[in-house]
Amino acid sequence: MPPLLKLALELGPLLVFFFANARGEMLIERFPILGSIGAPIFLATALFMAATVIALAISWSMTRTLPIMPLVSGIVVLVFGALTLWLHNDTFIKMKPTIVNTLFGGILLGGLFFGKSLLGYVFDSAFRLDAEGWRKLTLRWGLFFIFLAIVNEIVWRNFSTDTWVSFKVWGIMPITIVFTLLQMPLIQKHSLTDEENTAS
């Protein structure tokens, strides 16, 4: 899959979520039937769920596989989105990033506790690292996911819904990109050569 399309499929649902929340009242005025869903955050949640399903469907149709992280995130979006709409309580969709990041962080750190660098099983086809490299990278990403979970809790519990939505779209992604780039020296240091790949 082309990298730009992959990025679009990952960012698309988030942009739909942001736009629907920011322009929800305008959309409801133009399409009154949408008013039955409720406040803009509930409309945004419904469209976020739909966009997530569409993105996963496109990814599956092109590759016949679904990456584990987008798949798990998508399932949580649908479950917590459904709870948000059913109970008419936006707490559930706000807690979704906390649940997903805690889950990923817990799995990675738990794997390390049992001597398994699980990140290697996910990205081994993308690049090859030695055992120490995978261990360090798994530890860093595990702690980073826990950090994101804590930050999400702080933001949604202490700021307005609009601020939380903006941070979710325009804050988390840049932070993640910067963190990813900061891992490049580690990846380069522990990358296996072609000879080492063949030997392994």
From Swiss-Prot:
Keywords: Cell inner membrane, Cell membrane, Membrane, Transmembrane, Transmembrane helix
Source organism, top-level taxon: Bacteria
Keyword Cytoplasm (UniProt): no
Membrane topology: Multi-pass membrane protein
Transmembrane segments annotated in the record for this chain: 1-21, 37-57, 66-86, 103-123, 136-156, 167-187
Keyword Signal in record: no
UniProt subcellular location: Cell inner membrane
Function: Plays a role in cell envelope biogenesis, maintenance of cell envelope integrity and membrane homeostasis.
Entry protein name: Inner membrane-spanning protein YciB
Species, as recorded: Brucella suis biovar 1 (strain 1330)
Lineage: Bacteria, Pseudomonadati, Pseudomonadota, Alphaproteobacteria, Hyphomicrobiales
GN (gene name): yciB
